[in-house]
């Protein structure tokens, strides 16, 4: 009995999000085509600054410690498409993200 295996080349994309606390700021995707990196709109970085100032964290080690890179499960989309989809989702959900971030100030 002869077994023949066919290997399909899959696009395996590694996606990650740079965020400060729960506020995303940069989305990155890596696949065999290279790296795609997109910074979210300015309102996200402005939100980080506002929350950090209100918490008195600007210029402190604690501010720096709140920056994290979260890796997402691998995707079969291209890096370009995966990043585009995540960026669109975050931009649509900005008000929700802002509300959550500001509620942490209470």
Name each model feature, range by range:
Residues 16, 20, 24-27, 58-62, ...:
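Alpha-helical context
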Residues 2-38:
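Short, charged/polar N-terminal "headpieces" of proteins
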Residues 5-8, 21, 46, 65, ...:
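Intrinsically disordered, low-complexity regions enriched in small/polar residues
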Residues 1-4, 42, 88, 92:
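Short non-domain terminal segments
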Residues 26-30, 45, 49, 72, ...:
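Generic, low-specificity signal for short hydrophobic/alpha-helical stretches with a mild N-terminal bias
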Residues 14, 44-54, 83, 90-97:
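Charged, low-complexity, helix-prone segments enriched in Lys/Glu/Asp/Gln
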Residues 59-106:
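Acidic, low-complexity intrinsically disordered segments
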Residues 32-69:
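Acidic, aromatic-enriched beta-alpha/helix-loop junctions
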């Amino acid at each position: 009995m002869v077994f023949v295996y066919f290997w399909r080349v899959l696009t395996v994309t590694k996606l990650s999000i740079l965020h400060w606390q729960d506020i995303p700021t940069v989305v990155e995707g890596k696949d065999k085509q290279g790296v795609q990196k997109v910074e979210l709109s300015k309102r996200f970085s402005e939100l980080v600054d506002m929350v950090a100032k209100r918490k008195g964290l600007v210029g402190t080690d604690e501010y720096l410690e709140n920056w994290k890179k979260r890796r997402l499960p691998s995707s079969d989309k291209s890096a370009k498409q995966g990043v585009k989809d995540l960026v669109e989702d975050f931009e649509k959900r900005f008000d929700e993200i802002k509300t959550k971030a500001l509620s942490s100030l209470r």
